[in-house]
């Protein structure tokens, strides 16, 4: 039940000509203080039309407004404030959640539509660092949120398995690498070689040329180059899979950049057919001067392709394969120009589906105020952070609940959840200063706090069993009402998170629910025998449903015991 819509309907019967119901709904506010009611309508916009002060309009509207849904209507200055019938709303909200369970909050505006989400996309032969966490977890959450809105979701891990860096890595391996040493710890050793290349190239410019030459060989199918590339890729994917399992992240496919190698010439042909290619200093470009951007480089002067060519080819392939209505690219803000160019080239080709494509940037994880960089070796490995978080969770369990069953599994859920939630509680465009201490806190605005609240609610339900199907629910006290109002917002919160591509909307919401429930738990005798006992237990159950589902949308698990 959307009680704001009910309020808007009642007001639309008064403002039959002045405002539409949607306009009224858009104006309705939620008062910050409970004494001003559950919803408020500001009358400022009507002053000119009525030729009266907003306060007088509010008073007249309050006198006309009558609905059994409201227990009280009052004019306070320029606002019409209403108080909803708590019995009616709590009964409707709780019955809806009890009936729908984990389906509660589902929206259907995405039904029969497809969204492609491109996220995570680590580079082969480089360690999976904390810097990869944001794209991975934001994309994973957006995938769950889109599914909750009815979309068919294609989650693509566009692995960075092609490009000039492989020429550099092959050069470094052939100069300084040792096969036996690399086999012992492939990712770390290959990463060391990559960093060494960037150090050595400062004093030896010829290394850059060697790197370019090896990448050209790789593009031409040179046997040795391809064999080394396949080895680097295989070892990297093994490590990535282990980390994705720890994070609980899954993808529809791992079609990386190399997948499109044999399709790029066809796309370049399409650009030629549309007369969009120009030669510039031996390279092929699409001129974007009219759009106020530098030219989009399609092929370098040495004949090598560039990632823009692959991204353009991939976009057309994905549209032809999946027929997407939306396509999200969860990639850092440093790629903004690239995406502007990329989308503009597709528009120049006349593809209308580009209107559904969107770059979803995010802030950096900083270390000592600086962006982490794989070239300079300033890297904190995600796997090490996850392992430390899980170990800390184990220690907490041993101290607080040593007899807990499935300690290892719960520690994994809580430790990984702490890292994921820390990332997603921040608005995605905000930078995050890396701090292991803050990330692993198990109190305050953290994942473990929400998980513990869920476990606490589950423990109450284990003490009592109720046949909710036969109940009518009525909750009048302020603490229960605060929780009910929050639970009622869940579908709307999910829609907002989807429209904004913003998982932090969900994070903030589950924190609010957890905090409100804990106040309820501390002030209401839930298990005390009374006519409201079944209603109170129904509210506890509804909280477990919403917290578990809210955490799932973030990619965080909800243990029933901690």
From Swiss-Prot:
Superkingdom of source: Bacteria
EC number(s) from the headed UniProt entry: 6.1.1.19
Compartment(s) where it occurs, according to its Swiss-Prot or TrEMBL record: Cytoplasm
Keywords from the UniProt entry: Aminoacyl-tRNA synthetase, ATP-binding, Cytoplasm, Ligase, Nucleotide-binding, Protein biosynthesis
Catalysed reactions, semicolon-separated: tRNA(Arg) + L-arginine + ATP = L-arginyl-tRNA(Arg) + AMP + diphosphate
GO molecular function, one term: arginine-tRNA ligase activity
InterPro entries (alphabetical): Arg-tRNA-ligase (IPR001278), Arg-tRNA-synth_N (IPR005148), Arg-tRNA-synth_N_sf (IPR036695), ArgRS_core (IPR035684), DALR_anticod-bd (IPR008909), Rossmann-like_a/b/a_fold (IPR014729), tRNAsynth_Ia_anticodon-bd (IPR009080)
'HIGH' region, short sequence motif: residues: 122-132
GO CC, one annotated term: cytoplasm
Principal cellular location given in the protein's record: cytoplasm
Keyword Lipid metabolism: no
GO terms (BP aspect): arginyl-tRNA aminoacylation
Subunit structure: Monomer.
NCBIfam families recorded: argS
HAMAP family xref list: Arg_tRNA_synth
Family affiliation: Belongs to the class-I aminoacyl-tRNA synthetase family.
Protein name: Arginine--tRNA ligase 2
Lineage: Bacteria, Bacillati, Bacillota, Bacilli, Bacillales
Gene designation per UniProt: argS2
